[in-house]
């Protein structure tokens, strides 16, 4: 994905939150709640100083490995164009991030971690003071644009760990 300083950081952060960043996200609801394939299925962005990486996944039973990969790829496709983010999802993601933001500063360790990110990424001293305002500026149209521009099915990589003899036949069909 994008580097940490990219202007699309805030929309992509919000998009990830509703895609797989919390228990009411699309990935979690599909693979845990609807299908029962996993106890937890999430996505996260590993922000780096250069291009970053969006990861999605979770532990699943061997016999539903293929189906889990299919559903994950479907969710990527859906959020990009098949089933765009709704106003309700947008508002829930925004509110969830806002409500959870203070919990990033509850302990000394968390405070040190957040302050070290300022130095690591070369962020301004007022970054955290402006974080909520920057997220408030994100629109639903921004999420649609970022999903269409930043999630590219052609660049997705699939990594599966498990009993190769059991899972490879199903995965080779994809």
List each model region and its residues.
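M16 family metallopeptidases and their MPP-like homologs
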Residues: 1-3, 15, 29-81, 87-140, ...
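Active/ligand-binding-proximal structured segments within catalytic/core domains
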Residues: 6-19, 26-29
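PPIase-associated folding chaperone regions across multiple families
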Residues: 7-14, 151, 166, 170
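Short acidic-hydrophobic sequence patches enriched in Asp/Glu that either
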Residues: 7-10, 23, 71, 89
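Short phosphate-engaging motifs
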Residues: 23, 64, 166-167
């Amino acid at each position: 994905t994008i580097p940490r300083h990219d202007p699309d950081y805030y929309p992509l952060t919000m998009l990830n939150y509703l895609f797989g960043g919390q228990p009411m996200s699309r990935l979690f609801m599909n693979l845990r709640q609807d299908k029962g394939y996993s106890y937890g299925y999430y996505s996260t962005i590993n922000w780096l100083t250069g291009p970053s990486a969006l990861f999605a996944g979770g532990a699943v039973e061997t016999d539903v490995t293929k189906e889990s990969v299919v559903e994950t790829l479907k969710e990527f496709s859906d959020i990009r164009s098949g089933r765009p983010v709704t106003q309700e999802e947008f508002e829930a993601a925004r509110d969830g991030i806002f409500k959870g933001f203070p919990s990033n500063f509850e302990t000394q360790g968390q405070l040190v971690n957040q302050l070290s990110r300022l130095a690591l990424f070369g962020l301004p001293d007022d970054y955290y003071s402006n974080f909520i305002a920057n997220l408030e500026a994100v629109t639903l149209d921004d999420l649609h644009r970022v999903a269409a521009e930043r999630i590219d099915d052609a660049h997705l990589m699939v990594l599966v760990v498990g009993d190769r003899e059991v899972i490879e036949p199903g995965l080779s069909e994809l």
